[in-house]
């Protein structure tokens, strides 16, 4: 999704993957939920709504994958 489109997400290991590997599941899912809340609460106030909703969707997909016990897709 969003990560595949942006040039700065082209490194070998992404920070989000490192976080998933090193954090407890509860902490990692809390981080993802917090980012969803952040982007929902500022929708239309910072970046274009389409950019912010893309971020919301990305974090929601990652949360869904984490809940299912999967590694994140980028």
Language-model segment annotations:
Residues 1-74:
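Intrinsically disordered, low-complexity regulatory regions
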């Amino acid at each position: 999704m969003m990560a595949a489109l942006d040039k700065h997400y082209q490194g070998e290991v992404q920070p989000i993957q490192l976080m998933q590997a090193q954090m407890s599941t509860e902490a990692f899912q809390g981080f993802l939920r917090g980012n969803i809340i952040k982007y929902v609460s500022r929708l239309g106030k910072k970046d274009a709504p389409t950019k912010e909703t893309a971020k919301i969707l990305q974090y929601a997909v990652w949360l869904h994958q984490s809940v299912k016990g999967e590694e994140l897709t980028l």
